[in-house]
């Protein structure tokens, strides 16, 4: 049985050291990780292939298998993201909010690491490196607990990370992995508040619920939610169709993939057949409300489209597959009401009307809102953050893609000339 107390104590000690090391030393470790991933590519991909084969034999859904899969291209992207994190400005030590008080006290905030991060994740071997890289750059130690379904992949990548830390002269316990599949260890990690400062779960709704219900450590909830695109009559339909297709098919298992398409009634007769034909090329199943179904059922080429009547539950569902729900709405008010009821993750409007765009961005409550752009942009790499540890749907501490700055907090610093309080 793994001793989590020891792991936590080692992480806390490592975090104190990381908070003091130079940016150059942290960057050296990140480049060493990237180099190691490429040098050990065959070993990592072989381990991942074994994980994927087990998952396929067990009947794991294709969307989950896709999340598990590492390829040469994906591994190269992970390594490149690591280098991008090294190139980003180091937030630790930043001075901001300077002021001088009437008492003569000179006050400012200094950005500091959070401390020890616990990461619990399923079916996402890339998370091992993404979280480790960002935590290291932000001066945090991290305790990783990957799912048993990716155990070989996690072991292969954490070996690379450990070697890189040693090569860069950083504490080897700055990144630790819990390899025992016993779920009780997850519960213990969630309650290790003596050492762990924040928990970041990356997985399905059941994992997030388990973390929230069992944690005494603050939990960042995110990565789940229904994403919408609303299409107005003023949109350029020819250019809007590729945006919808990109949002749905580029990576359907991603949390920022399109789930529900809302189309203004005045746009529906022309736009719906256009987008249905484009989505059909990728075998996307269309779950349509009655008005959408009536328009598409008689459209040219409909016999090649996967049309299904939508169930009420489809409009609150994160599909994570080549399925999209489609609904015709009467106006922007109805679209906003629908998104308020079901959305909150990644929301977009396709429009040529600046007033509608401004209203949409002002009234939609979500982690990210886009005008004439795909929901797939809600991503740390796309935002220039290098990578992200999560896309938080929390309102407190961080919201949206969590990059370096979101992995820090601050300390108030007060300086005086032997000041006493009056």
UniProtKB/Swiss-Prot annotation:
It is found in: Cytoplasm. Pfam families: Aldedh. GO terms for molecular function: glutamate-5-semialdehyde dehydrogenase activity; NADP binding. One of its GO terms (cellular component) is cytoplasm. The keyword Acyltransferase does not apply. GO terms for biological process: L-proline biosynthetic process. Pathway: Amino-acid biosynthesis; L-proline biosynthesis; L-glutamate 5-semialdehyde from L-glutamate: step 2/2. Keywords: Amino-acid biosynthesis, Cytoplasm, NADP, Oxidoreductase, Proline biosynthesis. Its main location: cytoplasm. It catalyses: L-glutamate 5-semialdehyde + phosphate + NADP(+) = L-glutamyl 5-phosphate + NADPH + H(+). The keyword Oxidoreductase applies. Its EC number is 1.2.1.41. It is an enzyme of class 1 (oxidoreductase). Belongs to the gamma-glutamyl phosphate reductase family. This is Gamma-glutamyl phosphate reductase. The gene is proA.
């Amino acid at each position: 049985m793994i001793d989590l107390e020891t792991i936590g104590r080692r992480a806390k000690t490592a975090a104190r050291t990381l908070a003091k090391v130079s940016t150059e030393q942290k960057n050296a470790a990140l480049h060493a990780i990237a180099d190691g991933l490429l040098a050990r590519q065959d070993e990592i991909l072989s381990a991942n292939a074994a994980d994927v084969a087990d998952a396929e034999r067990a009947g794991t859904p294709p969307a989950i298998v896709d999340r598990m899969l590492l390829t040469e291209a994906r591994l190269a992207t992970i390594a490149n993201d690591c280098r991008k994190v090294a190139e980003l400005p180091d937030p630790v030590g930043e001075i901001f909010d300077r002021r001088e008080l009437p008492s003569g006290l000179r006050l400012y905030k200094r950005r500091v690491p959070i401390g020890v991060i616990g990461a619990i994740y399923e079916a996402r071997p890339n998370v091992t490196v993404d979280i480790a890289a960002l935590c290291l750059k932000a001066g945090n130690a991290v305790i990783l607990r990957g799912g048993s379904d990716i155990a070989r992949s996690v072991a292969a990548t954490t070996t690379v990370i450990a070697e890189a830390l040693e090569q860069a002269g950083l504490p080897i316990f700055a990144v630790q992995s819990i390899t025992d599949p016993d779920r009780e260890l997850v519960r213990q990690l969630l309650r290790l508040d003596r050492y762990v400062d924040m928990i970041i779960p990356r997985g399905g709704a059941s994992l997030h619920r388990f973390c929230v219900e069992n944690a005494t450590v603050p939990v960042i909830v995110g990565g789940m939610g229904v994403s919408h695109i609303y299409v107005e009559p003023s949109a350029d339909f020819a250019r809007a169709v590729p945006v919808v297709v990109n949002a749905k098919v580029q990576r359907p298992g991603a949390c920022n993939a399109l789930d529900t398409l809302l189309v203004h009634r005045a746009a529906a007769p022309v736009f719906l057949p256009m987008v249905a034909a484009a989505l059909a090329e990728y075998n996307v199943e269309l779950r349509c409300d009655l008005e959408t179904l009536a328009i598409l059922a008689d459209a040219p080429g409909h016999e090649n489209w996967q049309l299904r009547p939508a169930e009420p539950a489809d409009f609150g569902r994160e599909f994570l597959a080549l399925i999209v729900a489609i609904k015709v709405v009467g106006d922007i008010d109805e679209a906003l009401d629908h998104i308020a009821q079901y959305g909150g993750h990644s929301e977009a409007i396709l429009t040529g009307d600046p007033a509608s765009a401004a209203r949409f961005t002002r009234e939609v409550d979500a982690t990210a809102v886009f005008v004439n752009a795909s929901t797939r942009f809600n991503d740390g790499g796309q935002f220039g953050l290098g990578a992200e540890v999560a896309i938080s749907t929390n309102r407190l501490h961080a919201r949206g893609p969590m990059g370096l700055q979101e992995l820090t907090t601050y300390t108030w610093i007060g300086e005086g000339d032997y000041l006493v309080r009056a």
